[in-house]
């Protein structure tokens, strides 16, 4: 049968495989493409095609990530798979590959391992909304009681990190059996069950355009006779001419009205997520606005100076620091379009942070930034990126 062209009419969702090294993340990714290819929803990608992941740069950090796409009857998916543990850490913290949900792969033969725990913690910290579990390699386990034990362990681990461990779907199967065309009861049918669970359990993300308006300010001009224009790329939502907005961050929040929107020198009646626009703001002086602030729907985002973050610190080879740092370290935190100096407090029991570590830390900025949970930032010293992080929770 002729392969049907990917239809872009279905809702889109970004997912990825996470879990301990060698538990079968890449094999499962290959098995999903193989299974869905039979119904025209994917092009089969073999293990070695996925494993040879290209390097990409995100926020000054090099990350290897493989991207595959496929679709089920319900949704179109972009799926990320990383070759190494460090790539997962970097990917999740930088948000280079946004995940609306993830498939946690656990080997039934080994049970949860250190990186299983670490990936669940990272998923919690960076705000991955939902997980589905694939208990892989069940063909290597003869004892059904052992399988039940592993499932129980996984559920307890998920609950320990505030995921609903009792409710998360756990599918038991084998990626390898699927790839080798073995017993479909362990292989192909279980992969179909997994995708049904992903369809049903991972919520459809809200489209950026449906969220409250926010635009990071990149530049400010004054146009004689017209007033002040701020430019930037709309991150989310829609702004219409005549809308009241707030200018948030770095100084006291100001209310104003958008009196004009232009794009490529043409006047528009609105700007929406993804557009690079200039917004004319009423009664605002050129010196009252600066790069690093945001335009936002009133009340939708507030300025803060203190937060808890999850961060990855670059190795020397990645262009990062050569030496460790300690509590009271004062780098710059680059949010959206600007740097703000902040002080780092390490958690109790953590004496120092070595290049290559990922850590939880408390940060206090010297000036407030418009932020919400999940906001990404770079850690810089004199314009050079030495780390990346994500706001896990706001404390003040």
From Swiss-Prot:
Enzyme class: hydrolase
Gene3D superfamilies: P-loop containing nucleotide triphosphate hydrolases, Translation factors
Ranges for region G3: 81-84
Annotated segments matching region G2: 60-64
One Pfam family it belongs to: GTP_EFTU
Catalysed transformations (reactions): GTP + H2O = GDP + phosphate + H(+)
Subcellular location: Cytoplasm
UniProt record similarity statement: Belongs to the TRAFAC class translation factor GTPase superfamily. Classic translation factor GTPase family. EF-Tu/EF-1A subfamily.
Protein name: Elongation factor Tu
Organism (species): Gluconacetobacter diazotrophicus (strain ATCC 49037 / DSM 5601 / CCUG 37298 / CIP 103539 / LMG 7603 / PAl5)
């Amino acid at each position: 049968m002729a392969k049907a062209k990917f239809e872009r009419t279905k809702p889109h969702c970004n997912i990825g495989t996470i879990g301990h090294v060698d538990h079968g993340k890449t094999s499962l990714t290959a098995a999903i493409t193989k299974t869905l290819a039979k119904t025209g929803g994917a092009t089969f990608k073999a293990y070695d095609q996925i494993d040879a992941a290209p390097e990409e740069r995100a926020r000054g950090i090099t990350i290897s990530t493989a991207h595959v796409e496929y679709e089920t009857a319900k949704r179109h998916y972009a799926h990320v798979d990383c070759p190494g543990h460090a790539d997962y850490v970097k990917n999740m913290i930088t948000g280079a590959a946004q995940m609306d949900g993830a498939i946690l792969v656990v080997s039934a033969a080994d049970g949860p391992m250190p990186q299983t725990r670490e990936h669940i913690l990272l998923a919690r910290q960076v705000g991955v909304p939902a997980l589905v579990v694939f208990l892989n390699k069940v063909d290597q386990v003869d004892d059904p009681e052992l399988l039940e034990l592993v499932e129980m362990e996984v559920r307890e681990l998920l609950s320990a990190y505030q995921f609903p461990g009792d409710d998360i779907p756990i599918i038991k199967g084998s990626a390898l059996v699927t790839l080798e065309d073995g017993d479909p009861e362990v292989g192909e049918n279980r992969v179909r069950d997994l995708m049904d669970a992903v369809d049903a359990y991972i919520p459809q993300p809200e489209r950026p355009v449906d969220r409250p308006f926010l635009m990071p300010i990149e530049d400010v001009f004054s146009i004689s006779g017209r007033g002040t224009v701020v430019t930037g790329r709309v991150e989310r939502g829609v702004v219409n001419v005549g809308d009241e907005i707030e200018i948030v961050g770095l100084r006291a929040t100001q209310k104003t009205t958008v009196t004009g929107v232009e794009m490529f020198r043409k006047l528009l009646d609105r700007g929406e997520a993804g557009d690079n626009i200039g917004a004319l703001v009423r009664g605002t002086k050129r010196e009252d606005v600066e790069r690093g602030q945001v335009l936002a729907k009133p009340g939708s985002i507030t300025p803060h100076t203190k937060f808890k973050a999850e961060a990855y610190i670059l190795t020397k080879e990645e262009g990062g620091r050569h030496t460790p740092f300690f509590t009271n370290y004062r780098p710059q935190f680059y949010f959206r379009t600007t740097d703000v100096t902040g002080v780092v407090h390490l958690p109790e029991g953590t004496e120092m942070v070595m290049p290559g570590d990922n850590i939880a830390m408390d940060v206090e900025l010297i000036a407030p930034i418009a932020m919400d949970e999940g906001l990404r930032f770079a850690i810089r010293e004199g314009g050079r990126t030495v780390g990346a992080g994500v706001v896990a929770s706001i404390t003040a």
